[in-house]
Amino acid sequence: RSIFSFVRKSPTKRNNLLFVVNYTPVERSDYRVGVPKKKQYKLIMDENGLLEKPQTFKAESKECDNREFSFAYPLAPYGVAVFTY
């Protein structure tokens, strides 16, 4: 699908970052991404820049991308999303 995600772990294991990049012109209104922990993920930045009011998404026990947990959110065409957890 030409959508890539990766995690940047902090040395303290707090404030880790999850990046999701959509390299296609297709909007994904309910894109599901696999995540390493069943936690809340806060969307802090997207293709428009830093968010004044970050949105929070709760991971659920639903396998995706070879990960035990995942959550769904809207991903813009050629969009970028950065989450902290």
Regions found by a protein language model. Give the residues of each.
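Carbohydrate-interacting/catalytic domains
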Residues: R1-Y85
